[in-house]
Design a protein with these regions (language model features):
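Bacterial N-terminal signal peptides that target proteins for export
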Residues: 1-10
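Bacterial N-terminal signal peptides
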Residues: 9-18
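Sec/Tat signal peptide C-region and signal peptidase I cleavage site
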Residues: 19-25
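Beta-alpha junction/loop-to-helix N-cap segments that form part of ligand/metal-binding clefts
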Residues: 27-30, 43-53, 57, 62-138, ...
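Venus flytrap/periplasmic-binding-protein-like
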Residues: 77, 125-127, 132-136, 213, ...
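Extracellular/periplasmic Venus flytrap/periplasmic-binding protein
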Residues: 83, 93, 133-134, 142-252, ...
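Extracellular/periplasmic periplasmic-binding protein-like sensory domains
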Residues: 141, 248-328, 408-411, 422, ...
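Segments of small-molecule ligand-sensing domains
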Residues: 308-321, 332-406
C-alpha cells in the first residue's frame, strides 16, 4: 500500500513538473530570429539583432509584456536566401509551446522568398525600412509590414532633400543624378520609381549596378567621373559602402555630394573609409546615441548586468544597434496592443498581426517608452502598413554622425497610386481578393 502510494505520489510529482514546464513555455511569447552574424553583411546583422535582443532582454528584466515573458532563438542565414527560407521553416511553429509573434529577417531577398509562406502561416513579416514597397497596401498584403519607411518613400525623401538644397523641386530640371545600387532585389527595388521622379522633375537619371558584394567598383566610378553628376545616391549594403567612398575619393568626386540610403548610413559604413568618408551625407529614420531613456534603461538592466548581446560593447548606441532597439519597440508594442484585445497571454501570429495593423505611436506614447526622438511618430492601418515615411539627414564628420536636417517627408500622395497599382497587379497574379479596409476593425 505504501509502495503504491509512493509510486502514485512520484507519478503525480512528475506530472506536475511536466505541467509546470509546459505552462512556463506556454506562458512565453516567441520571436524567431533569422539572423546573420557572419559574411559580408555581418556588421548590419550583429548590430541590428544585438539591439533587438537587448531590447527583448530589457522588457523581460522589467516584467515582460503584461507578465508574459519573451523568448527567442536564432538561426544563421548568412544573408543567403535559401538559408533564410530553411530558417523560417525551422522556427515558424514556435519554441516549446511558445507561439511565434512575427518574423524579422532584415533581408529583402529572404522577405520576398518567405512572403507567401508567412501569409499562409498567418505570421507577420516585418521588414523595417525595407522590403516590398507595395506591401504598404495592407488590403493585399495583410501580413507584411514595411515599418517606418518603404523603399519608395526613401528615394522620394532623398529627391525632396536634393530639391531643398537646389532651391526647390522646380530647380531639379537639368540636374544630373546617378544612383549607384547594390546588385540584389533590394538594390533594384527603387529603379522604376526613381525614373518616374526623374520624368516628373526633369532631372537626368543614370542607374549603375554594383555586383554583390560590392568590393569592386572601379568601372562604375570612372563612369561617374565622366558623367559629372550633381549628386550620387548610394544604395549600398555592407562592404559596398566604404568601397564606394574610397572609390569616389580616387576619382575626385566629393563625399558631400553623395547621399547614402538607409542601408548606407551606419558607423560601419563610414569609418572604414577613413578620410574619404568625411562630409558624406546619409538618411536615417533614427539617430545614433545612448542618451535616450530607453537606451539608458538597456544599459543599466542588460549591459551593465553582463547580459548584453554585442561582442563589442563600443557598438552600443550605433545606428545599426539603435535600429534593432527601434525594431524591438515596434514588435513589443504590437504584442502589447494585441494583448489589450485578445488577453494578457501569449498570442498567435494572427493576433499579433492585428496589433501591428493598429500601431499608433504618438509623442506621448513615445515619451512613456523612453523613445521620444529615437522613433518617429507612427500610425498604421489596414491600408497603410508603413505608417511613417519620413527621414532625417546626417553627415559624417570623420568620427561620428551629426544630424543636419529636420524630418523630410516622402511625397506619399504621389507614391500611393504607384503602390496601389503594383499591389493590385500582385493580387491579380496570385488570385487574391483585397480586403475592404473600410470594414476593417
Amino acid at each position: 500500500m505504501f509502495k503504491r502510494s509512493l509510486l502514485s505520489s512520484l507519478a503525480l510529482a512528475v506530472s506536475l513538473s511536466a505541467t509546470a514546464f509546459i505552462a512556463k513555455a506556454d506562458g512565453e511569447q516567441y520571436f524567431p530570429l533569422q539572423s546573420y552574424r557572419v559574411g559580408p553583411y555581418a556588421a548590419g546583422g550583429t548590430g541590428f539583432f544585438g539591439g533587438f535582443i537587448d531590447y527583448l532582454k530589457y522588457v523581460n528584466a522589467n516584467g515582460g509584456v503584461n507578465g508574459v515573458k519573451l523568448t527567442w532563438s536564432e538561426c544563421e542565414t548568412e544573408y543567403v536566401v535559401e538559408k533564410g527560407v530553411e530558417c523560417y521553416e525551422r522556427l515558424k511553429n514556435g519554441l516549446n509551446g511558445a507561439p511565434a509573434a512575427a518574423t524579422n529577417p532584415l533581408s529583402v531577398g529572404i522577405a520576398y522568398a518567405t512572403l507567401d509562406r508567412s501569409t499562409a502561416d498567418k505570421l507577420p513579416l516585418i521588414t523595417i525600412n525595407h522590403g516590398r514597397t507595395d506591401s504598404t497596401d495592407g488590403s493585399v498584403f495583410p501580413y507584411a509590414f514595411p515599418l517606418q519607411l518603404n523603399p519608395y518613400s526613401e528615394v522620394s525623401a532623398i529627391i525632396n532633400y536634393i530639391g531643398q538644397q537646389s532651391g526647390g523641386l522646380d530647380k531639379l530640371s537639368g540636374k544630373k543624378i546617378v544612383t549607384l545600387y547594390h546588385g540584389s532585389p533590394y538594390g533594384k527595388e527603387t529603379n522604376e520609381v526613381l525614373q518616374a521622379l526623374a520624368d516628373k522633375y526633369g532631372f537626368t537619371l543614370t542607374l549603375l549596378e554594383v555586383p554583390h558584394p560590392g568590393n569592386e567598383q572601379q568601372s562604375q566610378w570612372l563612369n561617374i567621373r565622366r558623367a559629372k553628376p550633381d549628386w550620387v545616391i548610394l544604395r549600398g549594403w555592407g562592404v559596398m559602402n566604404p568601397v564606394a567612398l574610397k572609390s569616389a575619393q580616387k576619382v575626385g568626386f566629393p563625399a558631400d555630394r553623395i547621399i547614402g540610403n538607409i542601408w548606407s548610413n551606419s558607423e560601419e559604413d563610414a569609418a572604414p573609409a577613413g578620410a574619404a568618408a568625411k562630409g558624406f551625407i546619409s538618411i536615417t529614420t533614427h539617430p545614433s546615441g545612448t542618451t535616450f531613456p530607453v537606451t539608458q534603461g538597456i544599459k543599466k538592466d542588460v549591459i551593465d548586468a553582463g547580459h548584453g548581446d554585442l561582442a563589442d560593447p563600443k557598438r552600443f548606441g550605433t545606428v545599426y544597434y539603435n535600429l534593432g532597439v527601434v525594431n524591438g519597440i515596434l514588435n513589443v508594442e504590437a504584442v502589447r496592443l494585441a494583448q489589450e484585445k485578445y488577453g494578457h497571454k501569449p498570442l498567435s501570429g494572427e493576433q499579433v498581426r492585428w496589433g501591428f495593423e493598429h500601431l499608433k505611436l504618438d509623442e506621448a506614447r513615445l515619451k512613456e517608452l523612453g523613445a521620444l526622438g529615437l522613433v518617429q511618430p507612427l500610425q498604421l492601418s489596414c491600408s497603410d502598413h508603413e505608417g511613417g515615411g519620413a527621414v532625417r539627414f546626417q553627415q559624417w564628420d570623420g568620427e561620428k554622425w551629426n544630424l543636419i536636417s529636420d524630418w523630410v517627408q516622402a511625397d506619399r500622395a504621389l507614391l500611393r497610386p504607384i503602390i496601389e497599382a503594383s499591389a493590385q497587379k500582385y493580387a491579380k497574379e496570385k488570385g487574391i481578393t483585397p480586403r475592404d479596409c473600410s470594414k476593417a476593425s
